[in-house]
Amino acid sequence: MKRFMAAAIAVMALAALPALASEATFERNLSVSGQVELTVSTGSGHIHITQGAGNQVHVYGHVKSNWGSDSEERVKEIAANPPIEQTGNIIRIGGHHENYHNISIDYDVQAPANSFLEASSGSGDVNVAGVGENAKLSTGSGSIHATGLKGGFTVNTGSGDIYAEQTGDGDVKAQTGSGRIELKDIRGSLRAGTGSGDIKVNGSPVGDWRLETGSGSIEFTPGNTGFTLDASTGSGTVRTEHEMAVQGSFDKHHIVGKINGGGPTVRIQTGSGDVRIL
């Protein structure tokens, strides 16, 4: 009897659930004739952008609805009329998130390498490979992985790791509320910060740098670049593998001095963690 009652309760519980997830896909090819200004946004879903042909933008979308009695109809409607707008070489993908309650859209996009790029997700990872001049990448919750970014760029996530590689010169900003930051081949000014997580950077500080974490270690590899170092930790040690002309403080928690003859100021600070200049 007990087994029968348990089975009956389980059946009734399943019957009470809303309709299961629905999904659909769409593809579009957009012809372009010059440098593209590309914006991609989704309220919930991932964004993957890779290098494609120089005369077109290819969009593949995956629409999903978690629950809802009319979910299948809504998903099919979005797939039939995806949120894509084109005016010449200006392309906007996504937007109108307020109309997509309980619906997420993943975007996989191929675009010309020199496209001006802005990509944002409310919740989901953002991955970029070989595309983006002066890129702006953000997600509310998720990781960012970007390579081949041309010129300056800005990357920001509320919670998640950041990995980015720069090609050429330009100013860089990288921020995460909680997560690790790794930046490679940076040439320009830099501001990188995380509330909790390690920071690892290599590059040439041709402008001032500021690296900050509330809790975590910081590692900086400058090569032969000259700069002025001001590094401190609340709990941990500061060490450098380079010869340095000391200017003021020099102890295990705080050092100030010129490396390779000095230059732009590199300020490094962690509340709890070690600092290494390699």
Label the predicted regions.
Residues M1-L278:
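Intrinsically disordered, low-complexity terminal regions
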